[in-house]
Amino acid sequence: MAAAMGLERKAKVAEVALRCAVCALAALAAALVGTGSQTRTFFSLEKKARFTDMKALVLLVAAHGAAAVYSLLQLARCAAAAAWKGGSNGGAAVVAWSVFSCDQAVAYALMAATAAALQSSVVGKRGQPELQWMPVCGLYGAFCRRVGEGLAAAVAAGLAAVLLAAVSAFNLFRLYGGGGGGRKSSAGAVSGNGANTW
């Protein structure tokens, strides 16, 4: 029983740490890509490179911005659950399923947006000679470096979100495990030792 409580505590600490990491890294990725721009002059015409010029980068900024806000809200939920330790645990399964589903969706969205932005950025960096698309990073080097930094943060945020989804799965499915000596609630979830799901 003490080992189960220790494992549960480690899972909660890991959840908070990963939520902080996702929040910070996703916000950093969105800020780096979203604020990056560079202006070049071609034959007295100014052309400005912005993230809005590439739809995959728009998706990256939107997905990571939303993930940062979601992680911040989940951190507030964790803090509220830690502060409020008493009361009924009847809704633990509903909360755990909701958090698990949302964390899975966020992990998938971050990985998909990052993969799309990486692929588009490779085309921007190397071009596509078969289609006569020239590489643009030679012209907009500072912008491309800024996007590269944002993509590095986006990859890290995506990996942290995947780990967080695994922790959420643990938090959910431990409610249905039989080893904790808990009793079955009316919802079918184990609610042993008064443990709450945050």
UniProtKB/Swiss-Prot annotation:
Keywords: Cell membrane, Membrane, Transmembrane, Transmembrane helix. The keyword Transmembrane helix applies. One of its GO terms (cellular component) is plasma membrane. The keyword Transmembrane applies. Residues 34-55, 113-149 are extracellular. Homodimer and heterodimers. Belongs to the Casparian strip membrane proteins (CASP) family. This is CASP-like protein 2B1.
